[in-house]
Amino acid sequence: MFKHKLTNLIAAAAVAITATFSLSHARADELATLKDSGELRVAMSGQYPPFSFTNDQNQVVGFDASIGEAIAERLGVKAKIITTPFDGIIAGLLAKKYDAVVASMTITPEREKAVDFVGPYYHAGRAIVVKADSSIQKLEDLNGKIVGVTLGDAHEKWAKAQGNLTVRSYKGLPEMLVDLDAGRINALVMDSVPVMVAVKETGQKIRILDTPNIEGGRVALGIAIRKNNPELKAKMQKVLEDMLADGAYEKISMKWIGSDIR
């Protein structure tokens, strides 16, 4: 009887050890697979200068692209930049079309239910942008007006929730700025940083409304990865923190933005 019980205990322990090992191995799978492939597939819209856009050589470049490439290099792999519409970018991640989303994505409770975030890797503020000569002076003046937003981003959700705005969604900032200048929209809602950088290059005259109490006045943006990958998340977080500490992040930020936006 004792021998039988001992045998059962040994068998149970073996099963437990095997299960623990299998779980640990499964959790490490994505990081291990990534390293085995030698490639980190990084998704972004490619329509969001200066964070991601296509240059004259048909290469996707910008702050997000450079951050993705730097993280990949420190992981010991090469970055493969994949462009995809922002409104379907999380679905593509969950479908394993790429490994990470470096696309200026605001960290929200709703998104955290679907993905894990590395970061924040920068902070930004919600801006209401109008033409310099617009009669719109405050948030309340937008009542009944047409506002432009990026399809699928947090600002689109905010604008639609106001209930008093006509919301027009776009694939990216360049189209919005063209329509703002032409009067096809009265304002646009998005992160302040890319707007200021874009108009500095184009010379377009705009004004940002003073909205100190607006929801989302300062938001954190993160790098999205699939859930249940603790090793990958920890490794990428460590890489990002090292970049923030050793000057690599600041160098990238100064190149594309002109300031440190951490």
Language-model features, listed with the residues they occupy:
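Ligand-binding cleft/hinge of the Venus flytrap
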Residues: S52-D56, G68-V77, L139, G152-K171, ...
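Periplasmic-binding protein-like
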Residues: H123-V130, S192, M196, K200-E241, ...
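Extracytoplasmic small-molecule ligand-binding "clamshell" domains
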Residues: D29-S104
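Flexible hinge/capping segments at coil-to-helix
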Residues: V130-V147
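Sec/Tat signal peptide C-region and signal peptidase I cleavage site
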Residues: F21-A28
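Alpha-to-beta junction loops
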Residues: L40-R41, G76-K78, A95-A103, I146, ...
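Short helix-initiation/N-cap motifs at beta->coil->alpha
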Residues: A65, I81-A91, S134, D153, ...
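Extended ligand-binding regions for polar small-molecule ligands
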Residues: S66-R74, I146, L151-D153, R218-S259
